Amino acid sequence: VSHIIEENGVRLRLNIVDTPGYGDQVNNDRCWDPIVKYIKDQHSAYLRKELTAQRERYIQDTRIHCCLFFIQPSGHALKPIDIVVLKKLSDVVNVVPVIAKSDSLTLEERQAFKERIKEEFAFHNLKMYPYDNDELDEEERALNAQIKVNLLRRKPEVACANDFTEHHPIRRCWL
């Protein structure tokens, strides 16, 4: 699904790639491989186009820049498969964890689950966007710290549906 977003005179093509069926099999061994391969393939294809001597004036960017990783609000911790997949994905793309269907939780349940997830991310050394980077200057570190605080404190709405049409209701999800 593609959509053009324009804000402050800047046009951006937003491409949404869904991965239906991920982790739904009886044997989920290496179920993340097709996702990671797709992300890497998109980056490689863009780089090949960029490095050609006679490159096109406009190269459509099909790279995956961000992964919204929806975590089921089970009331427990992350599933073992989620931990493995988050590690694999964070090596190739910016990962933003989102609590799926969080509007079905009370404020207290949502906060407790969010804290549990943050603890698990720290325990398993999972990377969450924005990343800490030794090469950043002080201003960039401060900006990244503020982004991280905003992501953890605020509750921005995220539209989540299989299709953004009038036939599918859009549920609210909260970071």
Model-based region annotation:
Residues K148-R154:
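Short, disulfide-bonded extracellular cysteine-rich repeat modules
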